[in-house]
Amino acid sequence: MDVRRRSEEPVYPSKVFAADEKPLKPHKKQQQQQEDKNTLLIDASDALPLPLYLTTNGLFFTMFFSVMYFLLSRWREKIRNSTPLHVVTLSELGAIVSLIASVIYLLGFFGIGFVQTFVSRGNNDSWDENDEEFLLKEDSRCGPATTLGCAVPAPPARQIAPMAPPQPSMSMVEKPAPLITSASSGEDEEIIKSVVQGKIPSYSLESKLGDCKRAASIRKEVMQRITGKSLEGLPLEGFNYESILGQCCEMPIGYVQIPVGIAGPLLLNGKEFSVPMATTEGCLVASTNRGCKAIYASGGATCILLRDGMTRAPCVRFGTAKRAAELKFFVEDPIKFESLANVFNQSSRFARLQRIQCAIAGKNLYMRLCCSTGDAMGMNMVSKGVQNVLDYLQNEYPDMDVIGISGNFCSDKKPAAVNWIEGRGKSVVCEAIITEEVVKKVLKTEVAALVELNMLKNLTGSAMAGALGGFNAHASNIVSAVFIATGQDPAQNIESSHCITMMEAVNDGKDLHISVTMPSIEVGTVGGGTQLASQSACLNLLGVKGANREAPGSNARLLATVVAGSVLAGELSLMSAISSGQLVNSHMKYNRSTKDVTKASS
């Protein structure tokens, strides 16, 4: 069978036949296509085939600026001398010619082809449905001839696979390009550029946009562009940014994920608690859980609240120490205290002034006011009350100079003897008796070994180190984990972790009596981070979510006892691990990363 075939000819989408137009003859068509091809292959950069050597560039740059300076100088002289501008000398004429030549060269150097692409884009880059239909018709003519009676197969479906642009390799020392996220589109892109350029302050995005999540997304992209560092691993979705506005965090760009584990059940005062612990330290939750198991098997622990009062200590100054002492006697007078309490209590329906403790340093007086704060941690509440008292005392002592509403005699977020001795927040003691059988089977150690280790480590060792409130094994580990999980202030872990752990053999040396005394646990169940969804869920797990309307302050006090009970469990387990020599092995198993941490940041 004589089947004629013809080779496929290149087709250019810029040539499409109209409905009433006849196809060109073969030789004319080939000629037309060759002309179209030549037209398409013309590069805009060929318009100015000027050499671009370094010496030539330097010559034309120098000529351009020199001639411009000369012509501007002559122009100023003509204006000053009232000489017509069209009257030019031979040197000025040469300067004008040199200027034109340098401008032409510089246009070619900086890419005249870039400008021409906008002119020729409509002809060379256009692609519509007519072009595609024309190509399909041309391809369909490459099959068997229909006049020979051959069945014409359906043209195969043309699938155009998108070609991914080649990814440039980036050296470890190169600065990566800022990531372009979904926030970088449309109006958001303009806002991002304005923030990067300093036209819009980053802190004002929430108020300007009215959308906290959108503001966080834009701020995150801005940080990536400014620093050149990727924030891909910092999550943005799945968080209510309106809930932290004006309360928890300013200028957010995302949130950090911390795993939460459960230790328990902790049998405390006859009730069982499942304790949430947010931590990245392996073995911590497992160790605390073992301590809870030992306490549960021995009948549970007992916790007693000793004191409950938040403090704030302003600093005031007088002209003489005598005047400072007079104010000290005034505020410590029981009769005057009633008046001060009435003024203080006006700040809140939960705030109740309990006592005032004063200290003098020369002519400076520090007044440590202590008050109950209900279910709130109470720093804002007590500060408002202190301000009311200062305003009242200012009328009684006009020469009193208020240095600051906080004089560090409080003492907040710092290890201080005044907190260790007088207490701050909730002062709690928690105890349990662990039977000999549990010590051996669950804790894998001996009672005598635990008592000796506690004396030499937690008591003598801490004294040798000059510890202040640190007569324990790792109370801050448990306090921090529970604080983060329940929305407390992590910085107040400093004084809240003040703890002395005591161990003693009882019942003829067979059983172990263990106790922890913590004088300054600062917690609350309302306000701050407690209203966030995750932290609120953890508080709900403990049964202390929100304020207790029937007995104000009872939820916060119960949370403090749970913290102390958890510390008791953690102390018991860690001391047992050290006593039996299990500490290193357990940490090598549960607290050692296997990932490669040598990779450079991107």
Swiss-Prot record:
| GO CC entries | endoplasmic reticulum membrane; peroxisomal membrane
In its UniProt entry, the species of origin is given as Solanum lycopersicum
> Is the keyword Ligase assigned to this protein?
no
The cross-references to InterPro entries, in alphabetical order and at most eight, read: HMG_CoA_Rdtase, HMG_CoA_Rdtase_cat_sf, HMG_CoA_Rdtase_CS, HMG_CoA_Rdtase_eu_arc, HMG_CoA_Rdtase_N, HMG_CoA_Rdtase_NAD(P)-bd_sf, HMG_CoA_Rdtase_sub-bd_dom_sf
List the SUPFAM superfamilies hit by this protein, alphabetically. NAD-binding domain of HMG-CoA reductase (SSF55035), Substrate-binding domain of HMG-CoA reductase (SSF56542)
Pathways involved: Metabolic intermediate biosynthesis; (R)-mevalonate biosynthesis; (R)-mevalonate from acetyl-CoA: step 3/3
Membrane-crossing ranges are 44-67, 95-115
Pfam families xrefs: HMG-CoA_red (PF00368)
Identify the stretch(es) annotated as Catalytic. Answer: 188-602
| Cell compartments where the protein resides | Endoplasmic reticulum membrane
Q: Does the keyword Transmembrane apply?
A: yes
Name of the gene encoding the protein in the UniProt record: HMG2
What segment(s) does the record annotate as region Linker? 116-187
CDD domains in the cross-refs: HMG-CoA_reductase_classI (cd00643)
| Membrane topology classification | Multi-pass membrane protein
Q: What Enzyme Commission number does this protein have?
A: 1.1.1.34
The active site is formed by 281 (charge relay system), 413 (charge relay system), 489 (charge relay system), 587 (proton donor)
Sugar-bearing residue positions: 124, 345, 458, 591
GO biological process: what's one of them?
A: isoprenoid biosynthetic process
Q: Which UniProt keywords apply?
A: Endoplasmic reticulum, Glycoprotein, Isoprene biosynthesis, Membrane, NADP, Oxidoreductase, Transmembrane, Transmembrane helix
- Protein's UniProt name: 3-hydroxy-3-methylglutaryl-coenzyme A reductase 2
Q: Name one GO molecular function term.
A: hydroxymethylglutaryl-CoA reductase (NADPH) activity
Report the sequence similarity comment from the record.
Belongs to the HMG-CoA reductase family.
The SS bond pairs are none
Q: What is the annotated role of this protein in its UniProt record?
A: Catalyzes the synthesis of mevalonate. The specific precursor of all isoprenoid compounds present in plants.
The reactions it catalyses are:
(R)-mevalonate + 2 NADP(+) + CoA = (3S)-3-hydroxy-3-methylglutaryl-CoA + 2 NADPH + 2 H(+)
